[in-house]
Amino acid sequence: MTADNAIFIPPYKADDQDVVVELNNRFGAEAFVAQETRTGMPVLWVKRAQLKEVLSFLRGVAKPYSMLYDLHGVDERLRTQRRGLPAADFSVFYHLLSVERNSDVMIKVSLSEGDLNLPTVTGIWPNANWYEREVWDMFGIDFAGHPHLSRIMMPPTWEGHPLRKDYPARATEFDPYSLTLAKQQLEEESARFNPEAWGMKRQGANEDYMFLNLGPNHPSAHGAFRIVLQLDGEEIVDCVPDIGYHHRGAEKMAERQSWHSFIPYTDRIDYLGGVMNNLPYVLAVEKLAGIKVPQKVDVIRIMLAEFFRITSHLLFLGTYIQDVGAMTPVFFTFTDRQRAYTVIEAITGFRLHPAWYRIGGVAHDLPRGWDKLVKDFVEWLPKRLDEYTKAALQNSILKGRTIGVAAYNTKEALEWGTTGAGLRSTGCDFDLRKARPYSGYENFEFEVPLAHNGDAYDRCMVRVEEMRQSIRIIDQCLRNMPEGPYKADHPLTTPPPKERTLQHIETLITHFLQVSWGPVMPANESFQMIEATKGINSYYLTSDGGTMSYRTRIRTPSYPHLQQIPSVIKGSMVADLIAYLGSIDFVMADVDR
């Protein structure tokens, strides 16, 4: 599939300084403090008084930064390695992305503990809404002018701000929990929906509106997810997505785990993505450490990541078709996934959560006979995809339920932070594997599937075509697997190569310390985004020169995709919402972290 209106994506330049020149010309160089990082983008600190003006300029500049990719905070109070940075108790960063420039810029602002206030930027980027709510929820930073600044991850009755450094990280540091009858009633009452709090009316000119809870326990909600619908008959007048039921504090956990021992936790973010979750994390850590992995490691990582893209998309395909009323395909897609997991298990030893990538390499070399398993799979799957297309995706009922439903264009997708198949279904040719190649993707031949309607049907068809392209990539990995080691020869590779521990006592001691306490990473910041199964996933790491991360920010694609729902579905029927939810392809662990 192609689109006639695809945006031209220029070649990617890391640390592109063009925007810095534009900012200096507009505001003067003295308005900014540049920070040297390993994030691959300019990082500039600005004063709070100029923050909104700077962000508005970047939103309106030629080839604008149309996407607020991420917005979050850092508790700076215990950070020791801050040379050259503005004094700050807390900081908030705004990560902006321009598809037309194919470049990013990060704007930071410092705050003192006694004055945690910033202006809202929801008028510049609508998707700032949830991000600002989360920053308030996690850090207690207020955003003046926000339309509804309230808890989003934690329950409404929660006390404290969990990502502050003085907030306990372990359950044993809290008082024992007991659920009294009074507390239970308070929690139940706090979950009651109040339409007026969200600017909704209970009555129209000639009718009373009905308010319907879809979820948090509903099969079409795809997890613990609640949407409160304001209905006029079956027409959706407005809606409020309610998330946080699956929140596990993944970013807080990262502050108490070593760089190495956090790898299994990444598997549980998008729990259908497997090693795809490991990839941005280990790449970001390797940037901190200055590790360049052998070519064989890159090819192995790409091959396994594409296997998990296929397993995730197969699950999407089956449940999506089931959501619109066809039962049989989901049983076939689950059976087909098992064939992929047989290959994955033979290589990694595990199925859903291998936690198999390592800092500087992978856990072990490819086993004997891996090539035959992979060859059989890549020869078998294309015929199955042909059958799905013919039997289900060309079905007139499915087309009638999904074509033209929940459609949006490229401009709207970028404003809401939509990435992955949701963005490419609008005709925007932005796939990081092509636009910003990582791990050697530039060495592979594959196409980026596009559509042009941006509706529920196109989002499905793009993912089906992506599976075909993943097969092409896996086949090239099979035919061109390099020889060589499966770990980098670097002091911070974890676990280190074990062979030399049998020869030198100093190497044995270093190996013991690195495995037990974890490697010590240089003080710096790094960032890595990848084209994951559900869109762009990234890790933004801050090291203070220790064995654990000072701050780990996990930006997931499903989070902004759910925030976009009200802007797309208003005026549609409840049945259209079900088709829309299925077409998004999300899991709540990816949303709530």
Swiss-Prot record:
Region (NADH dehydrogenase I subunit D): 208-593
InterPro entries: NADH_DH_suC (IPR010218), NADH_DH_suCD (IPR023062), NADH_Q_OxRdtase_suD (IPR001135), NADH_quin_OxRdtase_su_C/D-like (IPR037232), NADH_UbQ_OxRdtase_30kDa_su (IPR001268), NADH_UbQ_OxRdtase_49kDa_CS (IPR014029), NDH1_su_D/H (IPR022885), NiFe-Hase_large (IPR029014)
Membrane disposition: Peripheral membrane protein
Domain of life of the organism encoding this protein: Bacteria
One GO molecular-function entry: NADH dehydrogenase (ubiquinone) activity
Entry function: NDH-1 shuttles electrons from NADH, via FMN and iron-sulfur (Fe-S) centers, to quinones in the respiratory chain. The immediate electron acceptor for the enzyme in this species is believed to be ubiquinone. Couples the redox reaction to proton translocation (for every two electrons transferred, four hydrogen ions are translocated across the cytoplasmic membrane), and thus conserves the redox energy in a proton gradient.
Protein name in UniProt: NADH-quinone oxidoreductase subunit C/D
Lineage: Bacteria, Pseudomonadati, Pseudomonadota, Gammaproteobacteria, Pseudomonadales
Gene name linked to the record: nuoC
